[in-house]
Amino acid sequence: METTAIIRGVHISAQKTRLVADLIRGKSVAQALNILTFSPKKAAVILKKAVESAIANAEHNDGADIDELKVTTIFVDKAQSMKRFSARAKGRGNRIEKQTCHITVKVGA
């Protein structure tokens, strides 16, 4: 039985988040949390919350044993980007896109 946790509209680019997501794909839950705890990246903190949420969902909804859970699937999708304006010299302006992403984590035995 797989249990899912989805976090939508996270303020970090999908490309940066995928780098960390690749580290924990297929690992046991304890090992994944250990990797994320000691990773210095911002995405690691966000992914750790997502994995912990998936564990809590599995325990509460399915009555799963935490020791047997693995990160079966994890993927990061690009979400809507926020358009911002940055003033430049001589009355010009540049558009800045602030990236967001959706994170989906599935845990199962």
UniProtKB/Swiss-Prot annotation:
Gene Ontology cellular-component annotations: cytosolic large ribosomal subunit
One Pfam family, short name: Ribosomal_L22
Source species, domain of life: Bacteria
Cross-referenced InterPro entries: Ribosomal_uL22, Ribosomal_uL22_bac/chlpt-type, Ribosomal_uL22_bac/org-type, Ribosomal_uL22_CS, Ribosomal_uL22_sf
MF (Gene Ontology): rRNA binding; structural constituent of ribosome
Keywords, ordered alphabetically: Ribonucleoprotein, Ribosomal protein, RNA-binding, rRNA-binding
CDD domains cross-referenced by the UniProt entry: Ribosomal_L22 (cd00336)
Record-level GO BP terms: translation
Cited PROSITE patterns: RIBOSOMAL_L22
PANTHER family, A to Z: CHLOROPLAST 50S RIBOSOMAL PROTEIN L22-RELATED, LARGE RIBOSOMAL SUBUNIT PROTEIN UL22M
Entry function: This protein binds specifically to 23S rRNA; its binding is stimulated by other ribosomal proteins, e.g. L4, L17, and L20. It is important during the early stages of 50S assembly. It makes multiple contacts with different domains of the 23S rRNA in the assembled 50S subunit and ribosome. The globular domain of the protein is located near the polypeptide exit tunnel on the outside of the subunit, while an extended beta-hairpin is found that lines the wall of the exit tunnel in the center of the 70S ribosome.
Assembly notes: Part of the 50S ribosomal subunit.
Family: Belongs to the universal ribosomal protein uL22 family.
Protein name: Large ribosomal subunit protein uL22
Organism name: Bordetella avium (strain 197N)
